[in-house]
A protein has these predicted regions:
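Conserved interdomain hinge at the start of the Helicase C-terminal
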Residues: 74-81, 155, 159, 166, ...
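Conserved two-lobed SF2 helicase motor
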Residues: 66, 122-142, 265-284
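Inter-Walker segment of RecA-like/P-loop motor cores
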Residues: 94-141
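N-terminal accessory nucleic-acid engagement/regulatory domains that precede
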Residues: 1-33
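Conserved strand-helix element at the start of the C-terminal RecA-like helicase core
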Residues: 84-99, 173-175, 180-181, 216-242, ...
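Conserved ATPase-coupling elements of RecA-like P-loop NTPase cores
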Residues: 136-140, 149-161, 179, 283-286, ...
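Conserved RecA-like helicase motor core of SF1/SF2 enzymes
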Residues: 242-304
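Post-DEXD/H (motif II) to motif III coupling segment of the RecA-like Helicase ATP-binding lobe
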Residues: 86, 149-207
Length: 304
């Protein structure tokens, strides 16, 4: 009865209501159907199919799995040196620079490509780069993907997934911590590629100090770990002022300066090293003890 009363009104907007109803139905039923279908054709259902060139290759993966300082990267780099062409993918600019230095020192011409630096060596067929800079359109005999456990990183993990699915190399070496092995294997098997797993074990024991020590108790060969450039510089100033020559390393330090700081520590021109946790990503240093200046780190969002 109420509806009939409204319709009986002289000024009731029947035409407008009908137009609105048809428009609502059009938006709800017609538009999604005819937009969704083309989008489904453009967006691959399976991420591996976004890399057709890699799918045409028969790739073989060698996974080096183990804890820190177990020789995973070393073994991979030895194979990379033997290849006619190759690419090394690092999580950090510092590590890419380190590998470029190693290859060039050993007579293998190697270029460098990171988000901040580009060092193109004439006639080089090898390249060391950060993982995000991988050229998916270039073929390499050997590809080394380092620190692959970072595939779980919320912000950067996509780059390791992209490298595994899309790198155009017949032989791919992956270095990873045990925690990521299952995920990496699933990705490789989804591509239909072959894989072998090499387990690496630490040859030196790790021992924990029974209690904290003071700065006055530091000894030559110790590394103090801080979690910011500001804190690194503060501790370095304190140790230098106390008569302990100190080297420093942090992520934003220009590579030539970092190389100089590392060389001074290697030659024992400095007693101590003060660094961020960036040195934990594959840098090989003769550190006697690792001393954390704090047990908390701000990861950009939270302190943990």
């Amino acid at each position: 009865e109420a509806a009939e009363a409204f319709l009986a009104l002289d000024d009731f907007p029947v035409a407008e209501l009908l137009d609105y109803s048809l428009y609502a139905l059009y938006q709800r039923d017609f538009v999604p159907k005819y937009i969704q279908a083309p989008l489904e054709q453009l967006i691959e259902v399976d991420p591996k199919d976004e890399y057709p060139a890699a799918r045409l290759m028969q790739r073989h993966f060698v996974i080096h799995v183990g804890g820190t300082n177990t020789g995973k990267t070393y073994q991979s780099i030895q194979r990379l040196k033997q290849a006619d062409s190759g690419v090394y993918l690092a999580p950090l600019r510092l590590l890419a620079c380190e590998i470029q230095d190693t290859l060039n020192h050993d007579g293998v011409a190697c270029s460098l490509l990171t988000g901040e630096e580009e060092d193109l060596v004439p006639m080089a067929r090898h390249i060391a780069s950060t993982v995000e800079k991988l050229n998916l359109y270039e073929q390499y005999e050997v590809c080394v993907i380092d620190e692959c456990q970072m595939i779980a990183d919320r912000e950067r993990g996509f780059a390791w997934t992209r490298a595994i699915l899309g790198c155009q190399s017949e032989e791919v070496h992956i270095c990873t911590a045990p925690e990521a092995l299952s995920l990496v294997l699933r990705l490789i098997k989804s591509c239909g590629d072959t894989v072998e797993v090499h387990e690496h074990e630490r040859t030196t024991r790790l021992e924990y100090l029974p209690e904290p020590i003071s700065l006055e108790e530091t000894e030559p060969g110790d590394a103090l770990i801080a979690f910011s450039k500001k804190t690194v510089l503060e501790y370095a100033d304190r140790m230098n002022a106390a008569g302990h020559p100190t080297s420093i390393i942090y992520g934003a330090l220009p590579y030539p300066a970092r190389r100089m700081q590392m060389d001074r520590f290697l030659r024992r021109e400095t007693e101590l090293l003060v660094a961020t946790d960036a040195i934990g990503m594959g840098l090989n240093l003769p550190v006697r003890r690792i001393l954390f200046t704090t047990d908390k780190k701000f990861d950009g969002k939270h302190s943990r």
